[in-house]
Amino acid sequence: AAARKCFGTWKRKSDGAYYVNQEYNPRRWAVAAAAAKQLTKMGYELHTVEADAQNPYPLASNVPTANFPDGAGNIDPYHSYSDMFTGEGIIQTNKEFIWAMESSNVTNYTHHSFPVKFGGWGSMSVPQRVIDCYLMADGRTIHNSSAEYPYEPDFSRLTGESKKLGTYLLRENVPMMYANRSARFYASIGFPGRYWPMSSASTDASYVNQQFWYSHDDTNAGIAGAGNNVNDYSVSGYVPVKYIHPDDSWANGKGSVKGAFVTSPKPVSYTHLTLPT
């Protein structure tokens, strides 16, 4: 109804057909469902990355340890998701992608997530309501978290020691509200206290292995480090990192950026047909 009201009279130039149906036709949903089912039988499958025996990703206790697809015992949940977007995976051999293309715009988009001091523009922000949608490690929501993987809304309560989640490092003294979260959360969100390797800038130790806090007085990533433009910092304290490779560094002359390949707004993949985002 909203679409019909806003642009219901728009027509395709090639044949004059309306973009929005002028009459209600429930059959179209059946046609769409049949088409989606047909796609699921065309050889597409979820992208997986083999588990790293040297750096195993700790699975939640309720996750089956059988081999995929009966469990996640032989895959790395973090890299199975992250590698599709950071340029680490190869698009031509990825059976999850149904439609995608290479685009330098995505690489340039990551420029907004890096702080000014580290060569970025620092102004990208993710709202708290999106952060709250990410699940806990065992698949529960933050509103129904378990005693084993609790959600702690008190920002002042901090983690103790650092924790390795496969090759991903959750540093010590990070607010507990960011612990016990799903692999997708860590692959997608730059949160206060997140570890940024920026390994390609390794010739200058002051530009690698950083933690950004996004607080007012954080001279690296807060308003205190925004430089001449006070808008060049994350107002929410969260930045998107989904397309950022651990090696990436925008620091001028001190690193490089690996080409992330997926076009915006996001690709159509087998995941979108079979799983919630």
What label would you give each PLM region?
Residues A1, S269-Y270:
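Extended, leucine-rich alpha-helical cores of fungal transcription factors
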Residues R4-N231:
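An aromatic- and glycine-enriched ligand-binding surface/loop that stacks and positions planar moieties
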Residues A221-V268:
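Active-site beta-strand/loop architecture of penicillin-binding DD-peptidases
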Residues T271-T277:
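Conserved small/polar residues in nucleotide/adenosyl-binding loops
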